[in-house]
Amino acid sequence: MGIFSKLFGKAADTICAPVAGEAVEIQQVSDPTFGQEILGKGIAIKPSEGRVVAPCDGTVDMMFDTGHAVSLVADFGAEILIHVGLDTVNLKGKHYHVYAKNGDKVKKGDLLMEFDPEAIRAEGYDIITPVIVCNSGDYTVFQPHVGKTVKTGDEVITLSK
């Protein structure tokens, strides 16, 4: 039995890294929509590769046509937004390849999209990737795990109601 289940009577829910790289505090994101937690609490990852995978089991709620972002609803209820880069909607899908579509049931680790980090950077965009829990206010415990290098599937957020 883990510490969360001892304290709160049930196991905590976890969100894993959807992309490999350096996990950092959300406040390091220069876009205030993310950095000031307007959309919800979260973390950001400075990607070291161009693959985005499902951070938990759930359903694809919205795969943006431009491929720069995806929102999922976790089986445990968290509403998760993964936004690859800042202002990358302006690329209109260039340098992104989408594998998942709206309504798809996904398992942790399933490939959602790929992107070309070098090409996006070369066009002048920051590829920092916010991972936001849009309904973070529904949780009494929100524990980010940042300040480390992560690979896809590593735990980056712990939640408990």
Task: Place the predicted regions along the sequence by residue.
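Contiguous, well-folded functional domains in the mature portion of proteins
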Residues: G2-K161
